[in-house]
Every structure is written in structure tokens, then in C-alpha cells.
């Protein structure tokens, strides 16, 4: 009986630890090593519009929208898609937008070896430089997942993990409607917010449609939209 009790307690502890690590891996407020940012601590009405993945089929359209609205944004691109769409990536850089590293293969970087993480980041850094982009390269983990080795690598290289605090597409009842996406952003925006959208693929048509609406809505609220690097300059 005592042996069975010990086994049961051990199983419960293991499951508890696994659950805790899972929650930590997706947390936007905690990581084991280094710095992370999900918003800038400021009272100024500034916010960053960020796009994950790509370059993809909608790159030209989103760039046309941003140019028309005179907005600079941050694009977290994957290495594989930069290789496939180098001309689009070069246009992103050429039009003065910020490019961040979103890994090479868009694999969850949890329970991966240090060598895998190093290769994913450094290969993509090299590809980003090939676009002509000369600014600081921030890193955003795929799916926002990080645990031990990724934060440790970034901290050793004095790089922060860039996350977000406004993500309308995470709500199934919102993601398929451009107006609802816009409303969610307008209702949840605050000084220093980092907004996450996915607009690069055909399946994200409603997200793409929401971009102009979001920009217009935030301008009406008195917000200035900028890149993540510029946003961080407003930190208290």
C-alpha cells in the first residue's frame, strides 16, 4: 500500500511539473533567463504593429497599405520564407520597416537542443542581413513558446524575447471577422502595446482587411504607430 501511495504521489508530482513547465513555456510574463517584452512601460500613446510569418502572398498588399497610411511596422519573418520570397523581404527592408527573427523553420523551440536553437536563429539572422536590413534584429519565438535553452541563448547574446499583449486572432469568435478584430484591438489597446497579426497568407484575408481599420481606429484614439525598436525607446 505504501509503495502504491509513493507511486501515485510521484505521478502527481511529475504531472504537476509538466503542467507548470507547459504554462511557463507559453507565458508572456515570465521566462527563466534574460529579458522579455510584451509591451513597453510608458504613458505615451504609442504602439507597435507587428506581423508574424512570411514573406507570403500578401506581402505586397500589406506594404502598400502601410505606405499609404505612412506607418512603419515590424515583420517577424521565418528564414525558409525569406529564402522563398527574397524580393518581398528586400522590399520590406527597403521601405524602412523593421525585420525581426521568427526562427528558420517555425518549429516550437521548446525541448530543442542548444545547437538546433543556435542554427535556427543564426541562419535566419544571416538571411535577414541579405535583405539589406541593417537595424537591430529582435527575436520572437514561434507560437510564443520558450523554456530553457532559447531564453538562455538570447540572454547570452544580449537579445530580448519580443512577445505581445494584444492578439485578436487568438479568439475563434473574432479571428474570422475584420470588424471584430478591429474592435478587439481598439478595446484592448493601451500605451506601449505590441499588437500581433498574421496577414501573409490567403487564409488570413480578414486579418489583412482589418489592418487599415485598426490604423484608422488607433489614430482616432490619438495613437502613434511605430516599430518595436522605436517603441522600446519610450520605456520608462
Name what the model sees in each region.
Residues 101-103, 163-167, 194-199:
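Short beta-strands and strand-loop turn motifs
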Residues 1-4:
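N-terminal Lys/Arg-rich, disordered targeting/topogenic segments
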Residues 61-64, 87, 91-94, 119, ...:
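Alpha-helical scaffolding segments of alpha/beta enzyme cores, especially the outer helices
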Residues 151-187, 223-234:
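His/Asp/Glu-enriched short active-site or ligand-binding loop at hydrolase and phosphoryl-transfer sites
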Residues 34-41, 68-69, 82-83, 205-236:
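C-terminal domain-boundary segment and adjacent tail
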Residues 125-164:
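Domain-start "cap" segments at the beginnings of catalytic or binding domains
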